[in-house]
Amino acid sequence: IPIPTSLTLSVSSLSVYTNVEQIHVYVTTLGAGNCTITPSLPNGLVFDSVSCSISGIATETLPQTTFVVSSYDVFGASASFTLTVNMCSNPIIEIERVYKGQSSKEGYKLINLDTEETILSVEPNSNQQDNTISVQRICSTASRYEVETTSSGDYWYKYSYLNVYVLHGAQREQILR
């Protein structure tokens, strides 16, 4: 088995919005661990030095910045990625999906009706777990959206549902259930 001498990350560049998008950047090199990162991450993002991963939702803006991850377990090899965190100046749409029974058969899409583009898609049989809640956020750019529910069965389970909220700062207004 060859010993790795370089480090590879799951992404090379990310651009996200504050308080909106969950990020997960990780080392894909087998055997990598005992890592460091420079410079410091913005608030809301957490670095796990054991798994060499970055996760969270950034809560402050950041101009395009290059971060370097180094692994002592791979002879100090390093890799870099760039991160830009922008402020979402539009309302934030939050989709809260409550899964109860038969969740693997259920899916939904969020469609921007201005462009007919699918903004968010969760297909049936894509690892949904019963008795869980999933939350997705987007920085809204459209004047109208459509939520389309799908199922690989005949219907959604009667206690499964979807809530849509608009976030205004710290306030959360429900607009659909």
Question: Where do the protein language model's features map onto the residues?
Answer:
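Solvent-exposed loop segments of extracellular immunoglobulin-like
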Residues: 31-37, 41
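C-terminal edge beta-strand
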Residues: 1, 75-87
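Short glycine/proline-centered coil/turn motifs in the loop regions
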Residues: 29-33, 61, 100-102
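Solvent-exposed, low-complexity, repeat-rich "mucin-like" stalks and linkers
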Residues: 4-32, 83
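Short, surface-exposed beta-strand/strand-loop-strand elements in extracellular ectodomains
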Residues: 105-113, 154-169
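Strand-loop-strand motifs at the edges of beta-sheets in extracellular beta-sandwich domains
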Residues: 43-58
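Exposed beta-strand face motif in extracellular beta-rich ectodomains
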Residues: 63-67, 143-145
